[in-house]
């Protein structure tokens, strides 16, 4: 019975609120005496920003550095030297030690639920050397289960 009373009181409150709002809104609106339905004399054309063409000389700052022509472009990104893991893949400088689509070498894609750690595709849920994330080893004698060392 209390639920029915609550439902009726909410319905009455809602009806009163709607009635008050519509009376206030209707009193403040003004009616235009003259409305022109003629076509505008000059059409206004707005350029679409999505399809706006860029100037020929303008360069995209996110564009690749065209490392196919000059592979040495990628070495400054990785710290240089022989320890650099940056490589030119598909005309882009890629860190092959941590990229899941180019793990260890170009176009070497890791399988589903694998992650690229140090250039190798590993299951971080069960690998003792990379438990839960890259370079997080479990202690001696512990197992990695579901990305946690000594789960049980």
Curated annotation (Swiss-Prot):
Signal peptide start-end: 1-19
Pfam families with a match to the protein in the record: Stig1
Segments passing through the bilayer: none
Domain of life: Eukaryota
Matches recorded under InterPro entries: Stig-like
Keywords carried by this UniProt record: Signal
Annotated family: Belongs to the STIG1 family.
Name this protein carries in UniProt: Stigma-specific STIG1-like protein 1
């Amino acid at each position: 019975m209390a639920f029915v009373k609550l439902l009726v009181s909410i319905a009455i409150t809602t009806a009163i609120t709607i009635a008050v709002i519509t009376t206030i809104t209707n009193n403040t609106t003004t009616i235009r005496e003259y409305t022109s339905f003629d076509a505008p004399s000059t059409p206004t054309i707005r350029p679409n920003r999505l399809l706006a063409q860029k100037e020929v000389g303008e360069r995209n700052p996110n564009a690749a550095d065209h490392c196919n022509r000059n592979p040495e472009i990628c070495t400054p990104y990785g710290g240089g030297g022989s320890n650099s893991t940056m490589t030119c893949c598909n005309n882009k400088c890629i860190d092959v030690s941590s990229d899941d689509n180019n793990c260890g070498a170009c176009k070497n894609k890791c399988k589903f639920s694998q992650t690229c750690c140090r250039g190798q595709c590993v299951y971080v849920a069960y690998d003792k050397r990379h438990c839960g994330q890259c370079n997080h080893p479990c202690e001696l004698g512990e197992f990695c289960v579901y990305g946690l060392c000594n789960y049980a």
